[in-house]
Amino acid sequence: MGGLTEISFASQYGRALIEGAEGLRKQELKLFGTYTLDGNTVRLFDAERLYYNTSAEKPCWDYDNTQYWISKASYNFCAICPYDAPCTFSDAEGRVILGNYEATTGCPDLLYASAQRDLAENEDFSTVYLNFRHACAAVQFNLVNASNATLIDVRNIRLFGMHNVGTFSFGADGSAGWVFIGSVLNDYSQAYGGACTLPNGGLPVNLNVRHSLYDGGAILVLPQTIYKTGVTLHLEYKKQGDAEYAIRNIELGWLGGSTPTEWKSGEKYEYNLTITDNTITTEVKVVDWVDHYVEL
């Protein structure tokens, strides 16, 4: 092709809530890209679908609208996962904008990436690394039975008191942020309702066994301050021999000690809920949740 170098794709796996490289490949990616030459900016990739081509001689990331590097141009790349995320690219701001994103139980992971390349001073046609980061935070609630009886049922699970709808935007320079839409979830919202399926026969008394409160595991939440707010986890449970369900409202912003004061983008928080005979205690820790890498 007259010495032109194609912009191609490859993948390298890192860990994420999307569990494994296959998760990223199944979701596919949406790419926006521009180049600027002699003061003129041109849209190079406009919501281009990146897919993992397993039929290629060597399986790789691929796309249909082949593009080539242009000497002396400067490039901006922005990408988002999943592909069907309803986002647009603002030429005026040079940012990808995802409006009215609603975080709920079971919503898909949301990842974003950006990169820049300036060929004006250096004719570098090598791989551009896109580091996909998590736009949301993740929380995992686990049950531990330290009581004197088997836990036989958990019901009416819900998380409320925080924002769950917002607009997310990010640019090729790596800047990113959220703007909340509307008020916080109230007690009656089912956005973060959930179910807890216990093992056959119930959850036994065992300090070494942690059972996920939500059947789906970790849930996504918008990054926000929780310290001294009304963010609350509600659940009701019954142990073997109990006449009634125990009703618990755990105020996550008032746990004290060294517990996190905010949920940060790209961080995952594990809340271990230990059920004793008459109460429930909570321990919180930040656990590993790192990112996916895609080579451009």
Q: Locations of the language-model features?
A:
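Sec-type signal peptide cleavage vicinity
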Residues: 1-296
